A protein has these predicted regions:
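Ser/Thr-rich, low-complexity intrinsically disordered terminal regions
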Residues: 1-121
Length: 121
């Protein structure tokens, strides 16, 4: 199962709902369908070319000692042993969309570059 994680940290304190709302252009760019949403969490489905290429995106606002962060997890059934090429492409697109549309929340961690979990997780 493929799993990619990114952590975003707002430059100024934001409410959880505002952090999730800032993701709207990213969700639209990924053509993600929101399945469940609360003030601090959302889950969405991203459909590729069939059931085997279906991906899930989870966004969770987490309280840390130095403030709130937004964690985004992209999951698919694609095998990581094959480097999960389709999931990796969606992950790269997600990173581009975040950089383009969410500059107020800089990326502080990405699992493909920094390891499986953030330090202190």
């Amino acid at each position: 199962m493929a799993r990619f994680l990114v952590v975003l940290k707002p430059g100024v304190p934001l409410a959880a709902a505002a952090m999730l709302e800032a993701l709207q252009p990213v969700l639209e760019g990924l053509r993600a369908e929101i399945e469940h949403r609360t003030p601090a969490h959302l889950s969405a489905m991203i459909r590729g070319g069939g059931e085997s290429q279906r991906m899930q995106l989870f966004a969770d606002v987490q309280s840390k000692t130095d403030g709130k962060v937004l964690e985004l997890v992209l999951l698919s059934r694609e095998a990581m042993g094959t480097t999960a090429p389709q999931t990796r492409e969606v992950f790269k697109l997600m990173l581009e969309l975040i950089q383009q549309h969410v500059p107020s929340m800089p990326l502080t961690f990405r699992s493909d570059r920094d390891g499986p979990l953030p330090t202190g997780a």
